[in-house]
Amino acid sequence: ETAAREGVFDPLFATTDKFNFEVVTLYTSGARHIYTNKPITKPEDLKGYKIRVQDSDTYIQMINLMGGVGIAMGQSEVYAAVQQHVIEGGENSEVVYNNFKHYEIAPYFSYTNHLVMTDVVVANKDFLDDMDEDTRATFRKLMKESMEVEFAAWDQNIEDAKAVLDEHGVTFVKADIEAFRERCMPLLESIANRSDMTREVYDKVQEIKAREA
């Protein structure tokens, strides 16, 4: 959140002009964590565990590095797949975990914090160019301000979901986040080194993380 507020991603977003759209703000969809039929506190706990991920080679590689086996699967298939022992669990935020009632088949929610998700809000450049200068400036200002509103709303969504999950007897587990991060460093470094710009953005995010630790 701090990185978004401080404009760390702005140089990256400026590259979208050539594609005729502009990034007008960033929203959050929270951090993602592992949920299964047992506590997951360290990479060794995931050994042999098949974890549902989105259909992405990067996501599959991430779970594999974390110690498990990444399985690409549609979200709507997860409940039955866990019930039938096709997979052992999934990874997502408390909100999605609650909405799909996955606590019924995977009652241990382990805070691995392996991904922090952002939603990028974009506007077509033609749409923006059709506005007069004052209207365009107001639009951009309000979109930036809406980020704080969305962040606060998401935090409330998390608290509301956790309250429901508590009622259903979910066990929240503290995981060794650093141990999982160490396992994923080869992937992180490969993504960071895709260009000078991504390297700079990654390093600035790490500086903020160290500052807030």
Regions found by a protein language model. Name each.
Residues F9-D10, A14-A213:
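N-terminal secretory/targeting leader peptides
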